[in-house]
Amino acid sequence: MVDMDRISISLPTNLLAEFDEIIEERGYASRSEAIRDSIRDYLIKHKWIHSLEGDRAGTISIIYDHHSTDVMEKLTNIQHDYEKLIVATIHMHLDHDHCMEVVLVKGDASEIKELTDKLTSQKGVKQVKLTVMVPGGNIPQ
């Protein structure tokens, strides 16, 4: 039998309600099982991102609440710290409260991961997705 630890978490009501809908839709026996699956997926994603090496090109997509204190300024300052990686950015207004930025990057994978981690950890950032590819000449044949 696997050792289990009991934990407690606080979630916004709407986030939990949406999660519960998915639990029911997918037929999970319990919230605990769904949370375990979600944590496993997160760990797999984390390991994949942190195993990347070499020269890469890709996008970092960021959704944030632009009303959150200084989030736009913090994101801009972080991007300026990594200007050698950033090829271009696209900014889009999603609704009255939220914006999306897509940052095109090219450079060393470890630096791209570092930039992604810094953007992800900012208060007001709701979601970050890193997509990377091997630049043209480096694609295995």
Swiss-Prot record:
Family matches, as InterPro entries: Acetolactate_synth/TF_NikR_C (IPR027271), ACT-like_dom_sf (IPR045865), Arc_rbn_hlx_hlx (IPR013321), CopG (IPR002145), CopG/NikR_regulator (IPR050192), Ni_resp_reg_NikR (IPR022988), Ribbon_hlx_hlx (IPR010985), TF_NikR_Ni-bd_C (IPR014864)
Q: What does this protein do?
A: Transcriptional regulator.
Source organism, top-level taxon: Archaea
This protein's record includes keyword Ribonucleoprotein: no
Which GO terms of the molecular function aspect are on file?
DNA binding; DNA-binding transcription factor activity; nickel cation binding
Cofactor needs: Ni(2+)
The answer, when asked if RNA-binding is one of the entry's keywords, is no
- SUPFAM superfamilies per UniProt: ACT-like, Ribbon-helix-helix
Cleavable signal peptide: none
HAMAP family, per database record: NikR (MF_00476)
Give the keywords, sorted: DNA-binding, Metal-binding, Nickel, Transcription, Transcription regulation
The source organism is Methanococcus maripaludis (strain C5 / ATCC BAA-1333)
Cofactor descriptive note? Binds 1 nickel ion per subunit.
Protein name as it appears in the record:
Putative nickel-responsive regulator
Family, as annotated:
Belongs to the transcriptional regulatory CopG/NikR family.
List positions binding Ni(2+): H80, H91, H93, C99
GO BP annotations of the record are: response to nickel cation
